[in-house]
């Protein structure tokens, strides 16, 4: 069975050389591997959270689609579609919203960062916070779960959202008594190439130090390479290749043999002007054919639209049967005669508490104890590997709940093993609320022990 890998493409801004080397090129290369069903989508609904300029959103969709196609994405081999062309995504988003606890969304990093910024400014915590920003992780979960993606490659800043998608999928599966959703695996992109910008810092639009991918043509590329900051060593003086931004850029686009030859030239005293020209020529050799294709595509948006519509049709063939199944599961299926409905076996209500494990954004492993209604009752300390976390989950089930779970202070409680706190309960409003949560957590552990 093939592995489904899903990649979302944010449709804000114009791609630069760093985007290509760090995300576009490796994703396209990965899509050609045997045994992989690759899904790529333009996340234009997500773009509306960050941008309220319709012209910019529309232009960015065109540029991003043209860029990925020009860079070698094969729409015949992969499923390439636009998020807004798949109505099943928004329908699933609502079904998932109805089972997602608000407390889970309260912990999302983007939301918490906005609240912290507002606190620093002395304004209301939710000032300027839209429901789009607040519920963004649910839409992301719908993007992933609709196609039952097995793997989702992300940077560390997105790990939490993937873990939330797993949590939401588990809650839905548990509530409606079937494994409707595959739990997606977080694939952290550890080897993502980070290119230096014109000033040596990470290439980023935020630093205004980017090298254009296609924008400005060959002249724009040449102009950018000429503006790369170098040290003051003169022609004839040996250069330190490892400390050179020029060398790092050259190495990212050259073969090992080419890279070694360029390094030798720098160490033998090649002037910075000649080095910049060599970098430009090496980049242009790769980018010129892609740029030509990009210009053709940008000038023919109808062709891109046809490709995206074909991709949407392909995607919806997979999405529609699942959504029909989910509609039936939640009671939104077609009306049936009373006799037919009576003949159907009643779905067994899901009443069990459960542990769920997840990987934190720093790479450590944790687990949560959830009540039957999905409320979080415990969150563990971090562990170096999943076996440690799993062993402690099993031990907690074997311990007497009254001994394992004890009050931490007036408004919180913790799980104790071997004299150490290994997990913490949520902070309550007062001692009475804490006692109620503690009793609920003990009941959940007892239920797990009896299962």
Curated annotation (Swiss-Prot):
Protein keywords: Aminoacyl-tRNA synthetase, ATP-binding, Cytoplasm, Ligase, Nucleotide-binding, Protein biosynthesis
Pfam family, one: tRNA-synt_1b
Compartment list: Cytoplasm
Broad class of where this protein is predominantly found: cytoplasm
Keyword Transcription in record: no
CC per GO annotation: cytosol
Motif extent ('KMSKS' region): 202-206
Keyword ATP-binding set for record: yes
Molecular-function GO terms, alphabetical: ATP binding; tryptophan-tRNA ligase activity
Binding annotation for ATP: 10-12, 18-19, 155-157, 195, 202-206
Binding sites annotated in the UniProt record for L-tryptophan: 143
Highest taxon of the lineage: Bacteria
InterPro entries hit by this protein: aa-tRNA-synth_Ic, Rossmann-like_a/b/a_fold, Trp-tRNA-ligase, Trp-tRNA-ligase_bac-type, Trp-tRNA_synthetase, YegP-like_sf
Physiological role: Catalyzes the attachment of tryptophan to tRNA(Trp).
Family indicated by similarity: Belongs to the class-I aminoacyl-tRNA synthetase family.
Protein name: Tryptophan--tRNA ligase
């Amino acid at each position: 069975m093939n592995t489904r890998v899903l990649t979302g493409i944010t449709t804000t801004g114009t791609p630069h050389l760093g985007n290509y080397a760090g995300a576009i090129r490796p994703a396209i290369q990965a899509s050609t591997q045997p045994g992989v069903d690759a899904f790529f989508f333009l996340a234009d609904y997500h773009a509306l959270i960050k941008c309220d300029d319709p012209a910019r959103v529309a232009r960015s969709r065109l540029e991003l689609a043209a860029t990925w196609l020009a860079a070698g994405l094969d729409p015949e081999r992969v499923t390439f579609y636009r998020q807004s062309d798949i109505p099943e995504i928004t329908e699933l988003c609502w079904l998932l919203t109805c089972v997602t606890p608000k407390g889970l969304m309260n912990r999302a990093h983007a939301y918490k960062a906005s609240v912290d910024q507002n606190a620093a400014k002395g304004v209301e915590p939710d000032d300027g916070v839209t429901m789009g920003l607040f519920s963004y992780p649910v839409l992301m979960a719908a993007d992933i779960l609709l196609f039952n993606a097995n793997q989702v490659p992300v940077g560390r800043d997105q790990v939490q959202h993937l873990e939330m998608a797993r949590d939401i999928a588990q809650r839905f599966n548990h509530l409606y008594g079937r494994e409707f959703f595959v739990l997606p695996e977080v694939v952290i992109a550890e080897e993502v190439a980070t290119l230096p910008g014109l000033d040596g810092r990470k290439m980023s639009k935020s630093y205004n130090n980017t090298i254009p991918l296609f924008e400005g043509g060959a002249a724009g590329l040449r102009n950018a390479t000429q503006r790369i900051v170098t040290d003051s060593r003169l022609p004839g003086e040996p250069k330190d290749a490892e400390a050179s931004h020029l060398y790092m850029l050259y190495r990212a686009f050259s073969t090992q043999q080419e890279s070694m030859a360029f390094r030798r030239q720098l160490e033998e005293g090649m002037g910075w002007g000649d080095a910049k020209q060599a970098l430009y020529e090496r980049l242009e050799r790769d980018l010129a054919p892609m740029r030509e294709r990009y210009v053709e595509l940008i000038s023919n948006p109808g062709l891109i639209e046809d490709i995206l519509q074909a991709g949407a049709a392909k995607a919806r063939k997979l999405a529609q049967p699942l959504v029909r199944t989910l509609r039936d599961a939640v009671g939104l299926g077609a009306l049936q005669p009373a006799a037919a409905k009576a003949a159907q076996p009643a779905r067994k209500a899901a009443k069990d508490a459960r542990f769920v494990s997840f990987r934190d954004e720093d790479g450590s492993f944790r687990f949560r104890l959830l009540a039957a209604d999905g409320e979080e009752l415990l969150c563990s300390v971090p562990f170096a590997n999943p076996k440690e976390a799993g062993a402690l989950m099993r031990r907690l089930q074997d311990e007497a709940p009254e001994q394992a779970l004890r009050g931490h202070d007036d408004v919180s409680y913790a799980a104790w093993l071997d004299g150490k706190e290994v997990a913490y309960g949520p902070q309550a409003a007062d001692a009475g609320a804490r006692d109620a949560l503690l009793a609920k957590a003990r009941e959940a552990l007892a239920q797990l022990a009896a299962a």
